[in-house]
């Protein structure tokens, strides 16, 4: 479960190893049967844009996106393989087709970063590859279970709506409120109206 970053000259630039492998805490199951987890945040540049990489199940841990944000990442490449399951299982249990796109849009908006979310086109698959811009809006999407190439202009200088821009850095530092706290008797009584 690794992603190799290769530059436009064909040189190996970096490697990302999936940090959160699928598997139970007790016992060796699923991914944990075959792989060991990574411990390295993969940050690299493409034409001056700081980029990061993640794999599949890593999306369940928003803390990884926050750490990449702290490292200045503006564009995340998040690779998935939510495909090749039976059509019956996909119909019965396609949480990925709902949860993954919603999570990626939320992570894009919460961290003000572009996210390229690719998935296998092997049918049946849970969802088609897409790009979310820093306000969470999906700017391009491939059809589900069809091979294709998605071309999107990514301009990190463009300005998008960012509801948390004023307080995000404080929250990252552990200050969990906006503005200035006020000491007030009524505010400190938690079990009174």
PLM ranges: what are they?
Residues 56-148:
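CN hydrolase (nitrilase-like) catalytic-core segments centered on the catalytic cysteine
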Residues 110-114, 119-193:
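C-terminal beta-strand edge segments of enzyme domains
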Residues 1-79, 84-85, 93-102, 164-170:
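Active-site catalytic loop in hydrolytic enzyme cores
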Residues 28-41, 69, 78, 84, ...:
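Short alpha-helical interface elements
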